[in-house]
Amino acid sequence: LELVLDDRIVIKGIQTDRIGTNWKFISNKLLSNNSYKLRLMSEGEGIYKSWNLKTFPSPEAQVENVSIMSFTCAGGPEGFKIAGKEFFKPFRFRQKVFDEGLSMNPDFAISIGDHIYWDLRGQNAPQIGRKNKLIKFFLGSYIGLVYGSFNRSEKASSSKNEKVLKNIGNEQIASLYGTRFKSTPIFFIPDDHDYFENDDAEK
């Protein structure tokens, strides 16, 4: 993949996964406080409509005003209810919050974790429910079937573990955010659940 800026600056993509669905683009040719039109290309063909993105002012610049959009704990799968109890907000609810914030044209956004809710509790897959062993078994088996289970004897970057990680991240991050922030720089700050555990003490 290539990222083309203003039809003149070409940035070669760097593939970061095995099958070519994750890429990063790095360039030192951009000017500070400048707006660019971006196009994503593959073998000379555009694969997404062009969009605009503005770089930050230089570190030495005297900035008079800055608008920041910030939110926390947006992670989790699509929301659902069981016996009247809500587990996570629906995607459309969270996306409405995103859209409301973006409508104010912030200069950048900060997404503070948790971005992922998938506490392993020392296992290969989440143990849903803390008391009922039957619930743990059936829901844990279902989750392992749908998303896969981590293999702790392999590296985190192994083919199997990468696939499980992407199954989780694609649902809780990629499907949630989509391309909403393509013209707004966004920084992700991890919290405890993003390391697949909750740091709260529990018996």
Predicted regions and their residues:
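Divalent metal-dependent phosphoesterase catalytic cores across multiple superfamilies
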Residues: L1-K203
